[in-house]
């Protein structure tokens, strides 16, 4: 019997070692991407900290290669370290047809990263006692029909209110104009909730539309004015604005989509007209990479209280390894580095905003191609340039120490000869 236990133990031990080695090799191999030549892609630099020149040069090669792989018309990137902008650069063409080069001041759609902006403004209103995150919204917004349950702002902000998502992609492509967030409630306010608030999670753009209507009513101002007063003006986000198809706006890139949705065949066309007035809070803002870095950096300062920041980055829902806070997703990357982030993907837009809180690194990537799939083999090596280098031998060494520790425990528990007196 003892021999059988030993055999099973060493078999399991060997399997654990094998699985660990295979996982680490797969992680290492997944990042070994052959970079495509991007010398023909124009680039324009705004900020370049010479202290990070090596990392920036490597990142240029990676991002240009990613543009080739994904057929991105333009891409804008900004990186900050310790709340200081160390790199801002744009690549490619803001308009493919006339070959207008993109630059760091080019303005992109940011898609669902708009939710992060809305969430920060919401927390600011809560700090100022303009609304209570935990009180029923109907006390503020009686225009929203009674659903038989209490719905709170924090439930809306964390996608736990039971407000339905889009039934199909076409709901995001509306051309109907609305004059306020309250008016845009007509699109869904009479629909039933899909679950009792607080009992489940369902990512909902309409939930954020309802949240913006609550903010409007609480402040007796339109949503755009609230965002400008509480966020854009104090943080000097001068290029962040709602997308109202205003022809007077300059520096706005041309938006493109793949001819075959979600494909990577290289065939693109201009995005169709969309009126974003009904979904500003969930996906209707324009911005630059530098403006979004200002927002990310501000959360490390005194723009919000530490209590508010902790509330924002608290996990309210989890799906496997992904957690959702107030306008932010949270997860650990393959190297177990904690990150706060949000993605944006829609017609004419793909965006990424990431904070690595333990390393004081913030990163923004914007593109004017809708639903672009940034490959892990490019995205992770790019971010690794500005983070502590993954040390693969350290993983092996830790594995070895853990296995020795387990071996000693098991050996002491089961295999030590008994002394019979």
What are the functions of these language-model segments?
Residues 69-76, 97-155, 194-206, 280-283, ...:
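Short active-site loop at a secondary-structure junction
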Residues 94-104, 373-382:
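A short, polar/charged loop-to-alpha-helix boundary motif
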Residues 82, 94-96, 161-162, 247:
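Solvent-exposed coil/turn segments that connect beta secondary-structure elements
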Residues 2-89, 219-221, 228-229, 233, ...:
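Catalytic loop of the DD-peptidase/beta-lactamase superfamily, centered on the K-T-G motif
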Residues 44-45, 93-95, 106, 136-143, ...:
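Short linear capping/connector segments at secondary-structure termini
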Residues 148-345:
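Short, surface-exposed loop or secondary-structure junction motifs
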Residues 58-62, 139, 210:
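Short, conserved clusters of charged catalytic residues that mark active-site
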